[in-house]
Amino acid sequence: MKISIINGPNLNLLGKREPSIYGDQSFITYFDTLKVQFPEIIFDYFQSNIEGELINKLHEIGFSADVILLNAGAYTHTSVAIGDAIKAIDSSVIEIH
């Protein structure tokens, strides 16, 4: 099984941004732990602060990943284009926060 994780704006600052709210662990540390705990799953990870790059990544992996876990950050509330990209691909997309 292949699971792709996509994080949107400001999620590159996890571990640094408001640690009292979001914790002090970087996403890369969490991602490395996830790969160790589930070695039978192929994980890949992408993060961007740019809406178009998130859409390009959805198009790129949206026909090969079994599941996409998407935390689009603030774009969850504002991006019609990301919603359209999700509708255009075959992979299952689960929105996470």
Where would I find each of the regions flagged by the language model?
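Mid-chain, well-packed structural core segment of small domains
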Residues: D66-H97
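Short beta->alpha junction loops
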Residues: D44-G52
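Short acidic active-site motifs
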Residues: E53-K57, T78
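Extreme N-terminal starter segment of soluble prokaryotic enzymes
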Residues: M1-S4
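A generic structural motif
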Residues: P39-F43
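Glycine- and acidic-residue-enriched helix-capping/strand-helix junction motifs
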Residues: L13-I28
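Short, well-structured alpha-helical segments in soluble
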Residues: N56-S64
